[in-house]
Amino acid sequence: MEESRGQLPSRVTIYEVAAEAGVSISTVSLALNTPARVSIRTRQRVLDAVDALGYTPKTEAVAQARKGVGRIGVLAPYTSYPSVARRLTGVLRAVGDKPVEVVVFDQESSAKSASPLLASLPLTGRLDGLIIMSIPLEESVAGRLLGLGLPAVLVDVRHPDFDSVHTDDVTGGRLVAEHLVERGHRRFGFLGESQQ
């Protein structure tokens, strides 16, 4: 990609990504938009090309032009688990009226899959940081995030290379039980979210 003095740098195109990855443009599109329709190996080749070239999809070009606005991505199974939706609400409240755009990516239940959506996101230039809630982080995805230098925080999952925030379910359960026993209750019921 060449840059002339006084001119904006040319934008990387999907054609260049396809050439770099050695695939067709339709394969690039599938790998980025419906990753389940391509093999893991092909998807990884496309993502490597996206990262190497700094490709930003056209729909994100306008967002790239924003001035003074940060962009945080939140990847979470929020439609699968009400508790995750409440955490997402907490993130939105914390951002408040700060000049930060929050982009939410809904991930199917983490009980069904690890992070295929995260593995397929074209991250270059799109986000300033990422919050990953309740989704195990595959090593290939962790390596990609580290390679891009994209700051990421995990919620309710652990990975040695990333900061994380956790609820202490054991202590919480013990405190609830102690509270109920102190009030004379002896038979308990539990209502929770199904892990589907």
Task: Indicate where each model-derived feature is located.
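N-terminal helix-turn-helix DNA-binding module of bacterial transcription factors
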Residues: M1-V69
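Short beta-strands and strand-loop turn motifs
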Residues: T27-A31, V74, L154-V157, F188-G192
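An alpha-beta-alpha
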Residues: V176-Q196
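Alpha-helical recognition/docking segments in bacterial nutrient-uptake
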Residues: E2-P9, K67-E178, E182
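Short beta->alpha connector loops of Rossmann-like oxidoreductase domains
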Residues: P57, S134, Q195
